[in-house]
Amino acid sequence: MKAVQLSSFAGLNSLKLVEIDRPTPSKNEVLIQVKAAGINFAELQMISGRYPAPRPLPFTMGFEASGIVAALGSEATNLKVGDRITSIVSSGGYAEYATADTNMAIPIPQGVTFAEANAITIQGLSAYTLLMFAARPQPDESVLVQSAAG
C-alpha cells in the first residue's frame, strides 16, 4: 500500500511517498481504509524536528484518520466491517490503511463527511478537554473562541 513517511526531521522535503505492507490489526484494533487524515500542529513540529518526543525514522505520518472499517482484530467486538469511523490511529493515518484501538474509534454519524469527522478527532477533542476540564465554564458564563489556529 502507499504511505507518506518521514525520512528525516528536515522539513517538508523529508516526506516521501513509499510502498509498505498493510498493517494487521492486533486483537483490540480495527483496520481502517483511510478516506481522510488530519494535519496537526504536532505533525508540523515533528517534520521540522521540533517535536519533544520524536519517533524513530522512518515512520508513517498521521495521528488521526477517518474511514471505513476493513477488518477487525480477534477481540474487537464493538465495531463491524463497513462501519464509518474516525480515530486516533496506531499505525499512521497518511496511508491507504491504518490501525486503531477500538476504544479510540468514534462512529461517524450519517450526513457527516470523513473530512468533517476527522476535524474533530484531535483538534476538537483538545478544545473540548481544555474548555471542560481547564476553563470549566459555569452555566451563566459565556465563552469566546477568538482563534482556532495552531
Descriptions of predicted regions:
Residues 6, 47, 70-73, 99-102:
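Short beta-strand-to-turn element immediately C-terminal to the catalytic PLP-Schiff-base lysine
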Residues 21-38, 50-92:
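Glycine-rich beta-strand-centered segment in the early N-terminal region that forms part
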